[in-house]
């Protein structure tokens, strides 16, 4: 989805928001111009999950694979943006697949964002990318209906524990209901107790008896060489 044509007015609110200041959020579809932000977000997620040794994604790789199909028919990315000024309420007619979610928040603590300059979609406006969710269709055969699988959901550290992360999961769930999707599912690292508690509070079931299985790298190539 292209950015809305009516941009919010520039403002002079300092990078550190005063206590009790209102903040505004928008969840929108990512576009090819957002690839640098998506790449940085995935890398920060790899650092948080202690999996940087597995991180090999490049901006060019993301650009060539993320936007080859219409939203919700293949890989889809939502970006969460934060601003001290209201976002425009007009909907971009060129992007009929999704209407951005707009919310207003009361921030109880100042937001110190040392990486802010790396996550500004528009240098003229005080809008910062705070998080993302990446998901795609799957097919729960027991339901005989399409599902959504969330591959990644991530909030940058300065914006955690402020209610923003809930918006990303809610946006996917609302879109699932709108499209008649049977279920939404994802995995969570077992040591991330805060995330597990958060998901359970959202009403999600956490299946402790299931295990993730994966073939990749040399193991995947070895399977290809088997005679069957």
UniProtKB/Swiss-Prot annotation:
<dbReference type="InterPro" id="IPR000182">
    <property type="entry name" value="GNAT_dom"/>
</dbReference>
<keyword id="KW-0611">Plant defense</keyword>
<feature type="region of interest" description="Disordered">
    <location>
        <begin position="1"/>
        <end position="21"/>
    </location>
</feature>
<feature type="binding site">
    <location>
        <position position="199"/>
    </location>
    <ligand>
        <name>acetyl-CoA</name>
    </ligand>
</feature>
<feature type="domain" description="N-acetyltransferase">
    <location>
        <begin position="77"/>
        <end position="227"/>
    </location>
</feature>
<comment type="similarity">
    <text>Belongs to the acetyltransferase family.</text>
</comment>
<dbReference type="InterPro" id="IPR051016">
    <property type="entry name" value="Diverse_Substrate_AcTransf"/>
</dbReference>
<keyword id="KW-0012">Acyltransferase</keyword>
<dbReference type="GO" id="GO:0008080">
    <property type="term" value="F:N-acetyltransferase activity"/>
</dbReference>
<comment type="function">
    <text>Acetyltransferase that converts ornithine to N5-acetylornithine, which is likely used in plant defense.</text>
</comment>
<dbReference type="GO" id="GO:0006952">
    <property type="term" value="P:defense response"/>
</dbReference>
<feature type="binding site">
    <location>
        <begin position="161"/>
        <end position="166"/>
    </location>
    <ligand>
        <name>acetyl-CoA</name>
    </ligand>
</feature>
<protein>
    <recommendedName>
        <fullName>L-ornithine N5-acetyltransferase NATA1</fullName>
        <ecNumber>2.3.1.-</ecNumber>
    </recommendedName>
</protein>
<dbReference type="GO" id="GO:0006591">
    <property type="term" value="P:ornithine metabolic process"/>
</dbReference>
<feature type="binding site">
    <location>
        <begin position="192"/>
        <end position="195"/>
    </location>
    <ligand>
        <name>acetyl-CoA</name>
    </ligand>
</feature>
<keyword id="KW-0808">Transferase</keyword>
<dbReference type="InterPro" id="IPR016181">
    <property type="entry name" value="Acyl_CoA_acyltransferase"/>
</dbReference>
<feature type="binding site">
    <location>
        <begin position="153"/>
        <end position="155"/>
    </location>
    <ligand>
        <name>acetyl-CoA</name>
    </ligand>
</feature>
<dbReference type="GO" id="GO:0009753">
    <property type="term" value="P:response to jasmonic acid"/>
</dbReference>
<dbReference type="Pfam" id="PF00583">
    <property type="entry name" value="Acetyltransf_1"/>
</dbReference>
């Amino acid at each position: 989805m292209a950015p809305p044509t009516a941009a919010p007015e520039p403002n002079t609110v300092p990078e550190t928001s005063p206590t009790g200041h209102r903040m505004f959020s928008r969840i929108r579809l990512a576009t090819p111009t957002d690839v640098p932000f998506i790449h940085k977000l995935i890398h920060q997620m790899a650092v948080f999950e202690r999996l940087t040794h597995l991180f090999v994604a490049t901006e060019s790789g993301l650009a060539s694979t993320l936007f080859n199909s219409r939203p919700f028919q293949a890989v889809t990315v939502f970006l969460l943006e934060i601003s001290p000024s209201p976002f425009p309420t007009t909907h971009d007619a060129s992007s009929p697949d999704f209407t951005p979610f707009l919310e207003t928040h009361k921030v109880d603590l100042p937001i110190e964002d040392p990486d802010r300059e790396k996550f500004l979609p528009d240098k003229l406006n005080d809008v910062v990318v705070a998080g993302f969710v990446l998901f795609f269709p799957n097919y729960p055969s027991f339901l005989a209906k399409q599902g959504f699988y969330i591959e990644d959901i991530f909030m940058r550290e300065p914006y955690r524990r402020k209610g923003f992360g809930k918006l990303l999961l809610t946006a996917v769930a609302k879109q699932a209901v709108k499209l008649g999707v049977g279920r939404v599912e994802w995995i969570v690292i077992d040591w991330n107790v805060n995330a597990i508690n958060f998901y359970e509070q959202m009403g999600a079931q956490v299946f402790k008896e299931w295990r993730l299985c994966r073939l990749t790298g040399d193991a995947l190539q070895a399977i290809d060489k088997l005679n069957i």
